[in-house]
């Protein structure tokens, strides 16, 4: 009986305003979690280094591991918000359409990186206020959102990754520059689709891990509120 009270009482006592505040605050925490997860995944180079072995990228591309790693590192540094120069691969030529696409990709990543810088302090204030007021429903909403959306995307990816990949590019990029020609933009040969799928999986795992933290905070505050 006591477990039911712990779980339900904070939600049952919510007013309409409280529900709105919980959902809005939960969305902010979720967006912060997504921005941080994307930024971490972008800079987590060991994932790519592992895929170099698992996906046999050297064999499929025809380039040595040293060349692949060097050019990949250049690409990651370019996508960092602190990098202000143009993209120049040490060993790969690049077409004008390829250059434009990478500029667009950098803008997309910048949204998440700047989003993380803005939302981290905002979320910290929100979390401290929720703990002070014992507003556990905020964490409940954040946890539910952080589970529901990644789970839905995960099902889509598991069902048809190629469709998800293509649809994402069509929505985000208003051109077909993302369709690389390996002869004019050989960098695409070291960036297999499977690597991006693994990146998506890591992002979702990080978000789901964050959702567990939200649920743990909700349960802890729910117990304190009952006492």
Regions found by a protein language model. Name each.
Residues 12-23, 120-165, 213-227:
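Juxtamembrane interface at the cytosolic side of transmembrane helices
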Residues 159-182:
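Juxtamembrane non-transmembrane "cap" segments at the membrane-aqueous interface
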Residues 177-227:
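Terminal transmembrane helical module of multi-pass membrane proteins
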Residues 80-118, 194-203:
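Individual transmembrane alpha-helix segments
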């Amino acid at each position: 009986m006591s477990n039911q009270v712990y779980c339900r009482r904070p939600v049952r006592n919510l007013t309409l305003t409280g529900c709105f505040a919980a959902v809005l605050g939960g969305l902010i925490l979720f967006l912060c979690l997504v921005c941080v997860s994307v930024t971490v995944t972008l800079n987590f180079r060991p994932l790519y280094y592992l895929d170099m072995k698992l996906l046999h990228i050297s064999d499929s591309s025809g380039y040595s591991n040293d060349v692949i790693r060097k050019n990949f590192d250049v690409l990651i540094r370019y996508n960092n918000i602190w990098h202000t120069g143009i993209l120049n691969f040490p060993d790969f030529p690049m077409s004008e359409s390829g250059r434009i696409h990478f500029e667009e990709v950098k803008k997309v990543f910048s949204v998440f990186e700047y989003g993380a810088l803005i939302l981290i302090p905002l979320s910290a204030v929100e979390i401290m206020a929720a703990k002070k007021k014992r507003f556990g429903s905020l964490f409940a909403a954040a946890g539910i959102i952080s589970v529901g959306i990644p789970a839905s995307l995960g099902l889509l990816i598991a069902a048809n990754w190629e469709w998800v990949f293509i649809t994402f590019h069509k929505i985000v990029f208003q051109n077909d520059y993302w369709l690389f020609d390996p002869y004019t933009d050989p960098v695409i040969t070291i960036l297999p689709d499977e690597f991006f799928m693994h990146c998506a999986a890591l992002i979702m795992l990080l978000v789901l891990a964050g959702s567990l933290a939200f649920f743990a905070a909700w349960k802890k505050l729910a117990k304190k509120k009952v006492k």
